[in-house]
Amino acid sequence: MLLHDARRRARLDDDGDLILLADQDRRRWDRAQIDEGEALLEASLRRAGPGRAGPYQLQAAIAALHATAATAADTDWPQIAALYGELARVAPGPVVELNRAVAVAMADGPAQGLELLDALAGTLEGQHLFHAARADLLARLGRIDEAVVAFGRAAELATTAPERRFLERRRAEVRAG
């Protein structure tokens, strides 16, 4: 929780709109919380022993990789994708698979991530994050019309006003080129 909370001040702009992780001002992250979170994670992993990490430890390891990357470009996406693969093994579920698909897209390219996402369509059809992730990958692949539709669906399903505004803004940006 410390690793996630450390980024809290950078998640919203002054108007209350979402700021994506890649666009957050990392200077606003709480380094003391990140350091404490890393130390607790390392101690927990030592106690568990090699190859015996549980779902919370794996989620914390993923959060630590995000929190310790100096820049968004420095994020170790292959390692994050591998950790999501392990998390899917010990705590399977469609949301874990959605996150794994995003990590794979970042590590290996949007086509690979979209293939994994599309396999989840029946399971996550009613989830805005599924449509948002799919829209982003479609846009990165140049499939603009499909991306616009997917961003629209994500906005319809969004559960908070900041998410809805963000998704509508992204849809307009993609549509405008």
Please provide the spans of the model-predicted regions:
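Alpha-helical junction/boundary sensor with strong preference for TPR arrays
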Residues: 48, 84, 91, 123-124, ...
